[in-house]
Amino acid sequence: MAESHGEAKGTASAHTEAEGGHGFPPFQKETFPSQIVSLVITFVALYVIVSRLALPKVGGVIDARQKAIDGDLAEAQRLNDESEAAMKAYESELAAARARAQAIGAETREKLAASSDAERKALEDSLAAKLAAAEKSIATTRATAMSNVRGIAADAASAIVQQLTGKAPAGKTVEAAVDASLKGTA
């Protein structure tokens, strides 16, 4: 194991040194100016390639994305404005519908009140007419009954007097007594 470690150490130094024992070329001071020139040329070439080819493509993609974003925002604003306008129209239509409903309700209440007043008046008139007819009928019935009562009372009084006295009283005397009794002047 010690041997393999020594071999590894020998191969490591072999990789860092050139065949002539000069070491790793990028670390040699003699090649620094040429390496720096190569580095500058490489970076200039890379800059030109990136600035001429890659940056315009990336810029185009960024511009396209920005235009798409702006378009989407404009579309969203337009749709928002449309929805707000539709909401305002809906609210105004709803308010108008409520006003119409209230007007229809008030009109219906007025019609129903007028109709019920007319029906009530007609019913009152009908009841008043029926009451007048009933009162007239009662008065007629009373007059008829009273005339019958007078005759019945006269006959009853005559029969009572005859029972008590044994003699039939005069018809005119009995009728005068019944008339006085019916009028309340006994």
UniProtKB/Swiss-Prot annotation:
Residues 1-26 are annotated as: Disordered. F(1)F(0) ATP synthase produces ATP from ADP in the presence of a proton or sodium gradient. F-type ATPases consist of two structural domains, F(1) containing the extramembraneous catalytic core and F(0) containing the membrane proton channel, linked together by a central stalk and a peripheral stalk. During catalysis, ATP synthesis in the catalytic domain of F(1) is coupled via a rotary mechanism of the central stalk subunits to proton translocation. Component of the F(0) channel, it forms part of the peripheral stalk, linking F(1) to F(0). The b'-subunit is a diverged and duplicated form of b found in plants and photosynthetic bacteria. GO terms for molecular function: proton-transporting ATP synthase activity, rotational mechanism; proton-transporting ATPase activity, rotational mechanism. Signal peptide: none annotated. F-type ATPases have 2 components, F(1) - the catalytic core - and F(0) - the membrane proton channel. F(1) has five subunits: alpha(3), beta(3), gamma(1), delta(1), epsilon(1). F(0) has three main subunits: a(1), b(2) and c(10-14). The alpha and beta chains form an alternating ring which encloses part of the gamma chain. F(1) is attached to F(0) by a central stalk formed by the gamma and epsilon chains, while a peripheral stalk is formed by the delta and b chains. Its main location: membrane. The gene is atpF2. PANTHER family: ATP SYNTHASE SUBUNIT B, ATP SYNTHASE SUBUNIT B', CHLOROPLASTIC. The chain crosses the membrane at residues 33-55. Belongs to the ATPase B chain family. Keywords: ATP synthesis, Cell inner membrane, Cell membrane, CF(0), Hydrogen ion transport, Ion transport, Membrane, Transmembrane, Transmembrane helix, Transport. This is ATP synthase subunit b 2. Pfam families: ATP-synt_B (PF00430). Coiled coil: none annotated.
